[in-house]
């Protein structure tokens, strides 16, 4: 019985540490690398455990960079007032503020989205998640 309890405890701890690593902001994103990216939405993926937005960003030379942004899960976006088919749609030009991936790829954890008309919606966790950094840029 003691051996079974010990093995169960080890398996539980192994699973817990893997879950915590998956949900660690600083494991994937750099709290010191804030980004503000403007582009055109190409796709909105409402999927658990995290929603994703994809943008085409036109560089000064005319080439296109593709960016992926992670956000709240769908149920949290809906509770924050998002509408699945109208809040963010392909073709919209937006500016997304967030934190860049540690590996330097065109991946970021989004915090807020600003639309062409100036209104802003929250797409990610509140202040402090970026390793205690300022969550929203000041205008």
Where are the regions that the model predicts?
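Positively charged n-region of N-terminal signal peptides that target proteins for export
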Residues: 1-4
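Short, linear, compositionally biased motifs with a strong N-terminal bias
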Residues: 10-11, 30
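N-terminal signal peptide c-region/cleavage motif recognized by signal peptidases
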Residues: 14-16
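Boundary at the C-terminal end of the N-terminal hydrophobic targeting segment
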Residues: 19-23
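PEST-like low-complexity, intrinsically disordered acidic/proline/serine-rich tracts
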Residues: 26-139
């Amino acid at each position: 019985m003691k051996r079974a309890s010990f093995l169960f405890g080890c398996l539980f701890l192994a699973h817990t540490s893997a879950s915590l690593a998956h949900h660690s902001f600083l494991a994937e994103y750099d709290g010191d690398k804030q980004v503000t990216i403007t582009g055109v939405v190409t796709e909105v993926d409402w999927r658990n455990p995290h929603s994703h937005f994809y943008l085409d960003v036109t560089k000064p030379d005319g080439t296109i960079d593709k960016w992926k942004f992670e956000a709240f899960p769908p149920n949290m976006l809906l509770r924050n007032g998002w509408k699945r088919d109208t809040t963010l749609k392909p073709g919209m030009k937006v500016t997304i503020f967030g934190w860049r991936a540690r590996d330097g790829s065109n991946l970021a954890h989004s915090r807020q989205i600003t639309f062409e008309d100036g209104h802003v919606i929250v797409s990610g966790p509140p202040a402090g998640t970026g390793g205690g950094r300022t969550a929203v840029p000041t205008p």
